Each structure stands twice: as C-alpha cells, then as structure tokens.
C-alpha cells in the first residue's frame, strides 16, 4: 500500500512541476541587455503570473526588472521624466519577451 501511495505521490509531483508557470527573474537588467543581478527562473506559485517592469528615459530603455508576481496589473505611468511600464503575462518565460 505504501509503495503505491509513494508512486502516486511522485507522479502527481512531476505533473504539477511540469505544469507550473515558469518566469524569468532578473532584478537588474541594463539597456545593454545584460542581467546584472538575480538572473534565473522562478516557478509561479498559486495566483502568481510573470511580470516585467521597464523604465524608460526619453524613450530609451534604462533598465528592467522581471519576477513571478502575485499582484500584477498592466500599467504605464510617468514619474520624474521617466516612463514606468508594468506588463503581466501567463505563459512560460513570457516576461523576457515583453
């Protein structure tokens, strides 16, 4: 009985793992397209999706930030002559392409 339970549990774990949303993480990506901090992949938890924040100055990308995020809203606003663009998506690695 315990062997069957362990086998079922293992299969369930791999199915859940295979279906988890994967997002790129980068806590500081520069305009030269290099991630300076926190590069990797996060597995979105319950109610999380992929998020990208990009900061522009005079129309030129200055830096970006990418993570798995629970509360995410597509939003663009201007503050101190910089444009902040939040984008949310829900397919694997989609925040890298935004």
Curated annotation (Swiss-Prot):
Residues 1-20 form the signal peptide. It is found in: Secreted. InterPro entries: Ly-6/neurotoxin-like_GPI-ap, LY6_UPA_recep-like, Snake_toxin-like_sf. CDD domains: TFP_LU_ECD_PATE3 (cd23579). One of its GO terms (cellular component) is extracellular region. Residues 21-97 form the UPAR/Ly6 domain. Keywords: Disulfide bond, Secreted, Signal. Disulfide bonds join 23-50, 26-35, 42-68, 72-88. It comes from the Eukaryota. Its main location: secreted. Belongs to the PATE family. This is Prostate and testis expressed protein 3. The gene is Pate3.
């Amino acid at each position: 009985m315990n062997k069957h339970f362990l086998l079922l549990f293992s299969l369930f774990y791999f199915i859940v793992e295979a279906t988890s949303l994967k997002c790129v993480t980068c806590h500081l990506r520069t305009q030269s397209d290099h991630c300076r901090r926190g590069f990797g992949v996060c597995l979105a938890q319950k109610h999380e999706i992929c998020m990208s924040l990009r900061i522009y100055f005079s129309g030129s990308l200055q830096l970006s930030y990418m993570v798995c995020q629970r509360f995410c809203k597509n939003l663009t606003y201007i503050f101190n002559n910089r444009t902040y663009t939040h984008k949310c998506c829900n397919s694997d690695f989609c925040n890298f392409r935004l």
